[in-house]
Design a protein with these regions (language model features):
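Phosphate-ester processing/binding pockets and catalytic centers
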Residues: 2-282
């Protein structure tokens, strides 16, 4: 099995805590299986080049072509699609709850821009620091992959594009977001790791997950047309291999007296996000 991963809107955290982020995970038998369906579903431009969800001035027409192709071949689609979504404000909560559960290995620091960072101790000599909301996204990404492994029973190779804030690698300090997610997966003894594309063929394998990710994220953020919402519902109802859902891991926080303070901390974090208008794009 090989699963291609795509995210919208990459990993940039917006000031709106109600803005949705979506991961699309499309699982195929092998590379040839992916390429067969890319040729069947994904539109091309006038030069015969495959077009991405957000590409070009004619992106609405291209999107409609992809969506209509999915409806046309709904009964033939034999790969899994799992589109997982959560709000930016909920990711802030995930970051803080994860911090409070793991304070022996995580500390808080201000970076040179004055942002509050979470610093994760990887080894005695090595640590990785991320702004809180980016940390929340990466931790949620880890939990989403864990869900795919534990609940959906998806195994094999997971192929991801570089995360938006990652510096291209290989090398020390490169692709830190992907490396951090892999670290969390390894610590959980999950037999899955994210792989990054190493050649042009691999870079082009995410075309279907790119479209499903954009499609579902537009539905979550209420920017999709009524027709496109109905078509995704039709697709997922007619083909059980296609699923779209909102997923927030159930994390609990217990204080030193053994009291569950999860609801109290969640309320404070979400209210703080709304008041402060957290924005970590820069």
């Amino acid at each position: 099995m090989i699963t291609t991963l795509d995210t919208q809107p990459q990993e940039w955290m917006e000031s709106n805590p109600n803005a949705f982020h979506t991961i699309a995970a499309c699982t195929f038998d092998n590379i040839e299986h992916i390429e067969y369906w890319i040729n069947k579903l994904v539109p091309k431009n006038r030069n015969g080049e495959f077009v991405k969800w957000s590409s070009g001035k004619r992106n609405v027409r291209y999107r409609d072509i992809f969506i209509n192709n999915c409806i046309k071949y709904v009964n033939e689609i034999d790969f899994y699609v799992n589109c997982i979504s959560a709000k930016a404000g909920e990711m802030s909560w995930i970051a803080w709850s994860f911090y409070m559960q793991n304070q022996n290995h995580i500390r808080q620091e201000k970076d040179r821009k004055g942002r509050n960072n979470l610093v994760f101790q990887i080894t005695e000599e090595k640590s990785i620091a991320f702004p809180v909301l980016r940390a929340g996204f990466l931790i949620w990404y880890y939990y989403a992959l864990k869900y795919l492994s534990d609940v959906k029973k998806i195994k094999g190779k997971f192929l991801s594009d570089y995360f938006a804030s990652d510096e291209l690698g290989p090398g020390e300090g490169k692709a830190l977001g992907a490396a951090f997610v892999n670290f969390l997966l390894k610590q959980s003894n999950l037999d899955i790791q994210i792989s990054l594309p190493t050649n042009e063929r691999f870079k082009n394998l995410d075309r279907i997950s790119d479209y499903f990710c954009g499609w579902v994220n537009s539905i979550r953020n209420l920017s999709a047309t009524k027709e496109n919402i109905e078509k995704f519902d039709l697709l997922s109802n007619k083909n059980p291999m296609i699923d779209g859902f909102i997923y927030i891991p159930l994390l609990t926080i217990i204080d030193e007296n053994g009291t569950d303070i999860t609801s109290e901390i969640m309320r404070k974090v979400i209210e703080g996000s709304k008041i402060n208008g957290e924005n970590e794009q820069n």
